[in-house]
Each structure stands twice: as C-alpha cells, then as structure tokens.
C-alpha cells in the first residue's frame, strides 16, 4: 500500500455522498424537500439524490446502506438552520449544542431513523453542551 507522501499532489478527495437505505422513497423525499429544504437532484423509482448547497445525500429503497446511519455535515449557520427546521416541523433530537471538538451541532432524525448532525464552528469562549448519544 503506498504511503501518503508518495501520492501525486493533483489527487484530491472532495467530499463523500452517503447512500441511505429507506423504506419509502416518496416519504423520504417529501421530508427532505418539504421539511429540510433540500431539492431533488435526480430520481428513479428506487433510487434518488437530494442536494442543499454542497451537501448531497442519496437514498436507496431496501438496498444499499443500513438503517440508523449517522451523518455529520458542516453548515455555515447552525442556529439559523435550527430555527428554520424547528418552524418547518423537523424531528429535532437536539437543538444547538456546543461540543469539545469545537463544534456547535444540531441533531435531526429522518423518517428512516437516520440521525443527521449538522455543525458549525464553535465561537470562542462558548460553554460545552451535553451528549445525548
């Protein structure tokens, strides 16, 4: 296996796009578009993708992926996102909370019990929150 130092400089990883297993694609797409504000990037009868900003997720009906997957994604303003999603009726597990890894996060549960953690950088001097795991 090659050492990291020997890889060419022009090979760069950009971002990962998780594939989440879902039971009902229509229900999932409705939640992500109507409640969470994502847009459908493309859709097939058993497979689809949504996008919001540079965050993309894929959904597969009863195929790829596993139930109860956890996703972590950075966001520019976690407090504004929390207020938006609270107003739209999102299933919020934890409001904005500060963590020792210098992150302020919210946690949302989707219809297939996937836990979505969205985070922004912690502001200096803010106190830490409590884990709910």
Where are the language model's segments positioned?
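Conserved active-site tyrosine of GNAT-family acetyltransferases
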Residues: 28-33, 85, 110-113
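Short, basic/aromatic recognition patches
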Residues: 93-97
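Conserved acetyl-CoA-binding loop of GNAT-fold acetyltransferases
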Residues: 35-40, 89-91
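C-terminal structural segments of small proteins and small subunits
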Residues: 101-102, 119-121
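N-terminal beta-strand motif that seeds the catalytic metal site of vicinal oxygen chelate
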Residues: 1-29, 56, 69-71, 120-133
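Conserved short beta-strand elements that form part of the metal-binding/catalytic scaffold
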Residues: 2, 39-70, 115-120
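Vicinal oxygen chelate
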Residues: 15-23, 49-51, 62-88, 104-109
């Amino acid at each position: 296996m090659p050492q990291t130092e020997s890889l060419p400089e022009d090979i760069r990883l950009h971002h990962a796009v998780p594939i989440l297993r879902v039971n009902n694609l229509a229900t999932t797409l409705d939640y992500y578009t109507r409640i969470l504000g994502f847009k459908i990037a493309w859709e097939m009868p058993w497979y689809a993708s949504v996008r919001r900003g540079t965050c993309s997720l894929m959904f597969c009906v009863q195929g790829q992926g596993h139930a109860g997957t956890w996703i972590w994604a950075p966001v520019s303003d976690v407090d504004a996102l929390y207020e938006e999603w609270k107003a739209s009726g999102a299933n919020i597990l934890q409001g904005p909370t500060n963590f020792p890894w210098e992150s302020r996060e919210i946690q949302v549960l989707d219809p297939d019990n996937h836990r979505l953690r969205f985070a922004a950088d912690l502001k200096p001097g803010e106190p830490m929150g409590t884990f709910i795991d």
